[in-house]
């Protein structure tokens, strides 16, 4: 017998969070495999998964229908399907309405909302399926018919239960009474039946119970999957299956019909986007080139403006320009980066600070006709003032037309294990022990080993189920959050383009699509990003201006300062933007930067792309004159001249494709995109053949062509654009110059911009002290909230360094202290600044009351007395007989410093243990630098950082600190696994190993690790670990 045609019209994906158990792509592929005529994705009050489903259906040639399931507050469950573009806009607006009136994650829908969306009736151009409950009311059906005449149905959902026949008969009678036709739907929650255990776990998690406690809340069987048409034909009358095709035929909308329109109010009356962009670009050129615009720049500007006009992107550039102008008007440091720095127009407008004409950067890396996608401009703002910029956008365009893009939070290994374990009834102690035992680099195949280490048999059925479900959950959407700064701004109501909902943060809204969805749909996104170093540099410059009496801006920093480069050549770069990592510090003495372009290369070279493409060593050897630079052809040599014949940047690969293999600039950009995705998706093969053929046609050696292809593959998704590296290099140089010439201001700026960077405040302070900076502890009599320079140039730490102390209390203290006479004692401080017991206790613990009460114990006593006096005598000062308490020991003070401040200005903890350590032949970090290559040696230090880069083939790099500085430890994979507990769990780590010395770069290669944390007693320190 022939199988009936069928279209699934009620289907949830895992974007119905904690309900659906399959990805949209899985559903589309399965629907095709089952021979379905169409598939509707109808996630609950959401269109978050529709772009993924649309792309998958398009790839498979499957008809895709956009819809959503929603329930009114009085329990009416409806599925809406969009017929056309207008219907889609109405559905999107309805979802927005329901979401915006509820807290994040929820929605509230009333029946009359269906009529409020459009003046022309209830949700025009949408079809409605009513999913009745167990005791449906004919009144609900009659209401539906009256509001949606000719476009409403009763959804019949049969799941092979004993009551199916009775339910079908009841719904047929209901349909006759109400005048509603019936249609078969599946209430699909998974693409295959095997996902049922995952769906059960999701249900239990949603209900905050275990699978065993969930009971009847779980589905009775696994029928809510995309069933075969044979199976459906045995459950449903033929006419109900045929009706699915009639409904699907009425749903003609495709997501490809969406068209984005740029905002227009940034364009003055009487101007067009093209004329205004040209006018502002001309103004910018006069500012950038006061001595006259070079002919090459003028030619480049005309080329860019022509391509921008052809692609109709003028309004996009002007929108970003307007945002940057606002930031500059408010003295907010900002700087464009990424591929936007390839644009001379962006440089003229002041959006970016890198002159692309000087570096011959390719505009097609940014805007390409062949790519046909809107450009993507990333702008970094001071992280503490970015909210001002965000609120400017909301104020200018309104929350109806501006919203942040979503970011999709998915399950990772630890979260998947934790949630699966909870739902399956494992104990919290077991779950915590397991997740705590995992390192960030543990692979899936290592999980059974971790289970076994905790005494759990990985082959026991219950544990196997835990592992299997956790594995299935990895990569599952958990919830939507807001993107770090990607804004979507539209000309009309944004809600008719994509649903908008409230963000967790007040005064913010977020769309239901993430950046990948936006890229796929060609919607404009402006990235308003936060960069801590911009905040730090602005603070540093402000302090320098205050101390010198001359206001200073970034453009006032002298260019090409030899002392700054000399400092970087010695890897003295702690706290310096982008070159403070272990890998960068190891590279600096080898590369020895002498000018700004060297910094551009430095930023790009220590990246997975050049490392995996085997470009680092050839570059360094050729730079140092130890390897000959191969001459290929004049055109090729010109592209690679500045990088010694080695392609370091994405733009160079694109230029090589153009000059060596006859690619067009647009084709070269397509090559770049294929490079970025080939490890995940493949797709480089056609480009390889074209490269080989093109280079052969130009008589270039095949060996050179093969080497370039191998390097392209090495680049993978990690190749660095020169434009991006140049933008970052500006901040590298500025921060390095400030560290070299104004180290105290540099330290203040970093401390006042935390959290940021690789290093903790403790390490930054230790480094500054090694550079001669005097650092003073927090003091309630002299400290502000922020750290600052005193009249002698010393850094006075701010009250922000005291853990748990509030900025409000600090501001009250500084306000009272400045307006009136200094505080007399702790009771006077409490009374005049309105401090509570907790405030005083925190100040005493942070040793910030020393000027008023003496050492910590005395201060804690004074705080207690002040509170008692305030309670008994209503704040009236009372003379209290002084009680002399013994001062804490050095060790007790160290413990208290780290507990309260996370740092100490007293002796380093290891200086107190040095004699004990020396007796056991543990040498200092300074001693390591004096020893020779291959020396067998032992050292010890407080663990301040662990890193395991993806390019390091399993090697873990550990940074240890002692009283003389930092030491770098290399732990190879075999030792990582053998001594993972010591590696991951030690606060004080002893290392027996062998020195590896290359010039100024010294590494201790570990042979054995020893956990010596017990020697620190109660001292609490924190390591900063990075993937």
Curated annotation (Swiss-Prot):
Task: Name the Gene3D superfamilies on file.
Answer: 1.10.150.870, Metal-dependent hydrolases
Keywords, comma-separated and alphabetical: Cytoplasm, DNA damage, DNA repair, DNA replication, DNA-directed DNA polymerase, Nucleotidyltransferase, Transferase
What domain of life does the UniProt record list for this protein's source?
Bacteria
Q: Which GO terms describe its biological process?
A: DNA repair; DNA replication
- GO cellular-component term (any): cytoplasm
Tell me one GO molecular function of this protein.
DNA-directed DNA polymerase activity
The record's subcellular location field reads: Cytoplasm
Offer one Pfam family short name for this entry.
Answer: HHH_6
User: Does this UniProt record's set of keywords contain Cytoplasm?
Assistant: yes
Query: What is the first-listed, main subcellular location in coarse terms?
Result: cytoplasm
> So what family is this one in?
Belongs to the DNA polymerase type-C family. DnaE2 subfamily.
Instruction: State what protein this is by name.
Output: Error-prone DNA polymerase
